[in-house]
């Protein structure tokens, strides 16, 4: 059967023994960890445009708010040269819990940070941070060793060089950590357009793929035109009754 005719799919809420979303990220088991997205560290990022990096991080924060995912942030020496966290995170995810550190490079070395993660009761961690090769990799490796499922969002993270980023991704793969992208996370968590908040998801796609915003605008305009035509026809029919 085709989707148009109502085939069984994840959109129906019907489970399948093979596929059907079971291998994808489960929102109900997920925590978003945003690590050291700080003004000073941004200045040495070379493997991605910082403007796009910030947009991807902001999108993840907005996505977490939309889907009611726990968000945990932390920063490395924010009063020193690393600088403050990017304000867009707090603006986009006001429910985020911030865990201060006492100089630990690896957030997983901070007992309060680990305790905060464990207290969510969730076992899937989506991590992003600056630098990828340090601030993401170190806690990702430790969390994986502690039994968590870990995803590293590479384009919501940044490194001083392409080489640093590539070697980090290789190490992730060796350790069983899943390298992913902001748009992949967005799609995995959304799953279907058949939902009441679909318009909000369309806005998020525009952040990670700016040209997609034009697609959404075009579709919205087409819907408005179609709705207006229907209303005109209904009014004409009513007038002749």
Describe the predicted segments one by one.
Residues 2-103, 149, 166-170, 177, ...:
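Active-site acidic carboxylates
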Residues 29, 121-123:
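Short acidic/histidine-rich motifs immediately flanking catalytic phosphotransfer sites
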Residues 56-59, 112, 135:
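Well-ordered alpha-helical segments embedded in enzymatic catalytic cores
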Residues 78-80, 104-107, 132-136, 161:
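Acidic, metal-coordinating catalytic cores used for nucleic-acid/nucleotide bond scission
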Residues 85-88, 112, 138-142:
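A short acidic, amphipathic alpha-helical/loop segment
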Residues 98-119:
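Glycine-rich oxoanion-binding loops at beta->alpha junctions
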Residues 124-182:
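A contiguous pocket-lining binding segment that forms or flanks enzyme active sites
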